[in-house]
Amino acid sequence: VDIDDISMLQVGRWPWPRPVLAALINRIAEGHPEALAIDILFAEVSARPNDDQLLRTALQNAARQGTRIILAVGKEEGTNNYLPLYPLDVIAAGNTLGHITFHTGRDGLVRGLYMEEGHLPAMSWALVDRTAQSNRNETLNMLLERRWDVHDSMLLGALKELPPTISAAALLRGDVSPDQLKGRKVLLGSTAIGSGDFFVSPLEDAQPRRISGLELHAVAAEAQIIHHFKQPLSAPLQGSIEVLVVLLTMLLLYRTSPFLG
């Protein structure tokens, strides 16, 4: 479910007030999806405290109808380490938490993610696998030791096309029935300009292009569902390949040198 540019034009600019997001979540819940992962940070208190309670009520309503809720945990640079940006307790209570971090390679492209960062499962993993859980106490202990642990690097295989998308505005207006979401694993976020993170990635149709964080989470979830991922090279093998490339380049330059007879 995409809060796209059209949704922004019709409903209002970003960030949307939490009562509007609550109405959207209620609308999604009418379709009884199996799980709903929300790629939106709720780390700050709303200007109107009752708005946070409205959002909590919408999440509780969805959970009562059998939908698993996964909320985003962001990350910011600390003095000596990373600091997780948790949702407000009033919003996070009772819900699964997942990290939303992607890392760029040396060439500036995103090709995968860590399945676990800071004792938090990747949001896409938590969406696909109900056994993926966060451990806030372990995260706190890690931060006290000034560490940010990452585990299980996963390289994603490119998809021919992205998973299907529904415009948030169309869902709110009633142009699209929430029944389309029945039993599905749903991601809610935004691809609108100025609303979130954007990356360059070859994960759609194997061609590097600008892609939103929401779309990357969708690719990661789909790749896990269909087991379409690659095994990353081990550090020693990666280093050996880089050395070999350097040696071959030096050999080529030597053989083509004009100073050789």
Language-model segments: which ranges?
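Substrate-access "cap/lid" subdomains that shape
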Residues: 133-176
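Non-transmembrane functional regions of envelope-associated proteins
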Residues: 2-145, 181-261
